[in-house]
């Protein structure tokens, strides 16, 4: 079957960025997949949160199905839906606590915000639907993202699911889509829409200094940027 999309190179050989078009295709493939609703929900929630937060996959998912590192794995009480006021309007966000961010070895971790977007890739909407339809009890001491059988949803399992869903969309021999494609995807999209290197580095926390700037940037400013990005995604999809 002819592949529909050729994802864009991120600057590293063999590494490709997720695009809004492929996110749209992924959502369509999930609807057609025949997977149980709870499984579709978890795949889409992880996808949208990784894109919107420019997260590394093991900042959100466990490395092992039957065990986890309490010092680094995201657990149920690490994510909360909250409100933020932006230009006099209240917008929802996910407050995500990263226990062990790569950029800084902070014993207390750090909290980042992922804001609602109102488009088809809205991470708040995806998260709430997954939480509503999850078939496991969300116990605070346990990893947040777990499957129906109780095992942890791992980065490896996520990559495997992406490949099954997108194998007829992208050429995996030439342009594989992996969990890290979401993080690269946001940076690529921002660059195409004329955001400065400083803004891109700050939102993606690409090095220690950018990490410090992210923390120093007021929450309202980050919310406004998320709103602008959502508008650009919507316009981009209309023109595609």
Which positions does each model-derived feature cover?
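Extended, non-catalytic subsegments within catalytic or DNA/protein-binding/adaptor domains
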Residues: 1-240
